């Protein structure tokens, strides 16, 4: 290559560099400023005040402990209506009940589906208790949203991103349970799918994680409740029933959850737990639930004294 060719090549290369679009530099954070977390929309850096989620007229995250109670599974119309009346009389704010059940074994009771949704809606009409129930896949979202006030994503579905994207489009609040092996960041990033997709009404639920311990069904991570309340503006509730798997442990862990500042409790209650079609071992009977509610009220009153 002669000198003229070299000069021409350099000239062309310089002109090309001037005309090319260089990527814009990322903004530089001030010295000492915390880096934004990956869960931007769920972070308290984005929103300082706790989000208050309205579920059928019940405010979750407003500073008062919200109690959601009812059977693991809706088994019959009389069962769910009787349970609804009795948990309301004891002081529950919302009615829980499973219509679609994601069981570990395919041979276990899988729920009554749409029929159970209709019975839940009837119980709400009679008692005035808003309904929380689980949705398993995106094909069922619309029908569940027609009957329920708070749509639950179970622990097994925390990272079902197709389901989360669908739930982000509905005008109903979502209760997002933590997966049994999920880190706190993974849990909050799952919530980010809902928030970034357009649904700002998200409630988080700690329901125990899987550890080496086998004496209980799961290990209730109360430290996570306190930490997530620091990291995120989303309200956090606790499910002491699934967290322990033993009805004798539900009341003390419910009180402990309230003590660390959770925004609500999700408690399984059955009129005859020993006859329940699912999770009877962790379900309180109505009398035990009433006693727990009395204890929670007394402790709340003492805390305010």
Name what the model sees in each region:
Residues 91, 143-152, 168-174, 195-201, ...:
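Glycine-enriched alpha-helix->loop->beta-strand junction motifs that scaffold or abut catalytic
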Residues 6, 10, 33-68, 301-305:
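N-terminal amphipathic alpha-helix/helix-capping segment at the start of soluble metabolic enzymes
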Residues 66-71, 93-97, 131-133, 151-153, ...:
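Hydrophobic faces of well-ordered beta-strands that scaffold small-molecule active sites
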Residues 96-114, 271-283:
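Glycine-rich, proline-tolerant flexible connector loops at the mouths of alpha/beta enzymes
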Residues 102-148, 152, 160-163:
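N-terminal active-site wall of soluble small-molecule enzyme domains
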């Amino acid at each position: 290559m002669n000198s003229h060719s070299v000069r021409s090549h350099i000239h062309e290369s310089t002109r090309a560099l001037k005309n090319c679009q260089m990527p814009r530099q990322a903004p530089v954070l001030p010295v000492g400023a915390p880096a934004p977390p990956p869960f931007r929309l769920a972070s308290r850096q984005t929103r300082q005040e706790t989000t208050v989620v309205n579920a059928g007229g019940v405010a979750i995250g407003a500073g008062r402990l919200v109690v959601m109670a009812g059977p693991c599974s809706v088994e019959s119309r009389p069962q769910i209506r009787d349970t609804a009346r009795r948990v309301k009389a004891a002081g529950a704010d919302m009615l829980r009940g499973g219509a679609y059940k994601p069981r570990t074994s395919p041979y276990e009771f899988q729920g009554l589906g749409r029929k159970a949704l209709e019975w839940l809606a009837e119980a709400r009409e009679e008692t005035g208790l808003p309904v929380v129930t689980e949705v398993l896949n995106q094909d069922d979202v619309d029908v569940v949203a027609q009957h329920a006030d708070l749509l639950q994503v179970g622990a097994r579905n925390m990272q079902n991103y197709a389901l989360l994207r669908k739930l982000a489009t509905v005008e109903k609040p979502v209760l997002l349970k933590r997966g049994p092996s999920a880190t706190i960041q993974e849990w909050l990033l799952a919530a980010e799918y809902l928030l970034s997709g357009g649904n700002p009404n998200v409630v988080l639920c700690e329901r125990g994680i899987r550890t080496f311990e086998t004496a209980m069904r799961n290990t209730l991570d109360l430290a996570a409740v306190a930490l997530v309340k620091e990291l995120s503006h989303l309200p956090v509730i606790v499910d002491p029933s699934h967290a322990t798997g033993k009805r004798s442990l539900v009341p003390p862990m419910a009180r402990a959850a309230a003590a660390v500042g959770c925004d609500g409790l999700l408690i399984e209650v059955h009129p005859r737990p020993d006859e329940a079609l699912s999770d009877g071992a962790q379900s309180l009977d109505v009398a035990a639930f009433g006693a727990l509610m009395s204890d929670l009220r007394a402790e709340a009153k003492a805390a305010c004294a």
